[in-house]
Amino acid sequence: MEAIYNPQAIEATVQKFWTDNNTFQAIENPDKEKFYCLAMFPYPSGRLHMGHVRNYSLGDVISRYQRMQGKNVMQPMGWDAFGLPAENAAIKNKTAPGKWTYENIDYMRNQLQSLGFGYDWGRELATCKPDYYRWEQWFFTQLFEKGLVYKKNATVNWDPVDQTVLANEQVIDGRGWRSGALVERKQIPQWFIKITDYAEELLDDLDQLTEWPEQVKTMQRNWIGRSQGVEMTFAVADSTESFDIYTTRPDTLMGVTYVALAAQHPLAVAAAVDNADLAAFIDECKNSKTTEADMAAMEKKGVDTGLKAIHPLTGKLVPVWAANFVLMDYGSGAVMSVPGHDQRDYEFALKYGLAIEQVIAGQEADDINKAAITEKSTLINSGEFDGLDFEEAFKAISDKLISENKGKTTTNYRLRDWGVSRQRYWGTPIPMINLANGESVPVPTNELPVVLPEDVVMNGTTSPIKADPEWAKTLYNGEEALRETDTFDTFMESSWYYARYCSPNDDTQMIDPAKANYWLPVDQYIGGIEHAILHLLYSRFFHKLLRDVGLVKCDEPFKKLLCQGMVLAETYYREADNGAQEWIAPTDVEVERDEKGQITSSISKIDGQPVLSAGMSKMSKSKNNGIDPQEVIEKYGADTVRLFIMFTSPPEQTLEWSDAGVEGAHRFVKRVYKLAHEFVESTNNSAVVDIAELTLNADHKKLRRELHKTIAKVTDDIGRRNTFNTAIAAIMELMNHLGKAKVNSDEDKAVMQEAVRAVVLMLTPITPHLCHHLWQLVGGSDENVEDASWPVVDNSALVEDEKLIIVQVNGKVRAKITVAADASKEDVEALGLNDESVLKFTDGNTIRKVIYIPGKLLNIVAN
């Protein structure tokens, strides 16, 4: 009998068994309830980090649990393989992005397999392979034909030295990351998909997602940003020109003292011809950042265009300014400014000496001379609209604008169309052809895929396909033409991969509708909350597009969403001579702690000198505090890593890495191993008598009661609540009871066998290698644990023959008595009143009242 737990040997053997037997191959079976579990696929960056391990451990535990519930489970894995990091690594390592990516995929696949995740590897996909992205290209051409794709000029970051477009993260303090040149804002043609056509449905269908975190749904609602407002027209004085503005606060219209245009607004550009200050300001704005966060933080600037706008209701002339806080890409590129009731407008008006008028009554403490009054209230100084509240004023003012053909009520969305063009190399080529006449047409279906050449040299500036004029040359209807040399935003690939998993090897169609409609929607999706908006919103949008061309039937891609927390680790550093922090890996630090676990000393293992602790922070390369999963697996085994990950904190919360915690998890795994082996030894390999044939004593019944209470709790914790940590804690508590139990009589062995089998089954989703091995010892059949059913609660075992009753006298505990479970109130009162310990406090007193809470408490009031 094996006395020592050897995780490496067990795990290698079990993983080979799974591979040889295609244990986790998923096949459609209409007679069986399906369960599609998916964790967000990784970018193949080189090595798995602990965040990956946590994400994929959660998915695997859920998948294995659902399999044991008798469901037909699919859990696939693949690679989100396009993206900028591959280009940067290719430049650094002087290799092609494709080669670097495929090598990383091979290494990370081995890491995932070493952790024992039950993936159907026959469904593996990589988004950088033509057999995947050809269908993305095909689908884009279908969207173009449906009128859902268009091309327009949009602003990008332009490096004038490297002559290339930069991603936002490549702009550091306004300069190009390689050249150091001041980055310019430049307009270039880009492709867009009309996600705004689906804005209302994307918003309304959030109500269907009852098993998504409210936080994620709120973030998406805010991003889509539906608002009810009024669109109105301002005419330009002494001109035939006019412009539209949209506002959600028409109640403040009578307080407009100026209007603000985006610097790129056609009226501002035209006015700049004769206005040098305005022209200079427009040039300055070209290089300004345009994210909402950047704009909120930057100094608000503007220049008077010299134009006057005519107030649509009063006819009053108001100045027209060009301002850097108005974006041409948002709305009409013009806003009405009401400094009395908008703080940004207020500060701008103070800065440039513009009028501030109060048209909304404030609270007593409000002072228009100190700040804008932004709350909604009663109108004042608004002529015929005085005395109206917000709702009344909204209707009255919009009605008047409509009656005079100067405005209309409208629903607006903050959401903007999805710009999918990227001026990068390592991505899916956009399947469009630019003709000599300026028209753009889709690549014919029979010429797809447009294959990205992978044998390239990265020079750090221009994309290889942009630098190679021969690659772009093509023919269209016999005429010379040029291919589009932009590639897709990598969110395109990750927006439909979940659906491709349903038929990943189909080379005749994007998705097999029959298979997709069997597996979809995904029953459980798992990933970080940082993907709450873009990835999850784009996937929901893409799914509706797939539905509308008949490839899927359901409205939403992901039924239930779990957002796991980050993995944290201790961080250590020294201050360099220049004041910078030099981060030191936790594995290179010797730490001493007090009895509360607080660090009292941290010494470098390398030079023996003290280092400083910066506390817990997210594992990252920048802080050098990552823990390599491979090293922990090699030391303790994958099951220990999985158990630690699942036990240390609830899935939505942050997980603090702890070497002591890993040691504790390892000890528990060894305890389970030892208990099972010792039980088998105690039976001398002879059959255990069926528990149904035996008469159990009180101790046996108590142990069975603990067992079945544990099964009930673990089933609920894993299956409904997803509180894996409390499920494991319950199993640990049960193990404490089992460790004290005798294994001598037939009854002892029968109860212990039932308990050991249940423990192995309950731990199977969490520590699958160990449990596969132990089930062969204790399972009692030829069935492998992967095909075993989840343990079922025996309700009869939960029935108690006796109850422990607490007896109080005047509110203080004086005795504990054991009574029959079906004892009457009178019997319990008699036993309690005559208990020796109770009589000490009631003798000589009058019993005033006896209160009995059935099965729990007897309270005697005596004086």
Swiss-Prot record:
GO terms for molecular function: aminoacyl-tRNA deacylase activity; ATP binding; leucine-tRNA ligase activity. Keywords: Aminoacyl-tRNA synthetase, ATP-binding, Cytoplasm, Ligase, Nucleotide-binding, Protein biosynthesis. Transmembrane segments: none annotated. A motif ('HIGH' region) lies at residues 42-52. A motif ('KMSKS' region) lies at residues 618-622. ATP binds at K621. It is found in: Cytoplasm. CDD domains: Anticodon_Ia_Leu_BEm, LeuRS_core. The keyword Transport does not apply. It catalyses: tRNA(Leu) + L-leucine + ATP = L-leucyl-tRNA(Leu) + AMP + diphosphate. Disulfide bonds: none annotated. Its EC number is 6.1.1.4. This is Leucine--tRNA ligase. The gene is leuS.
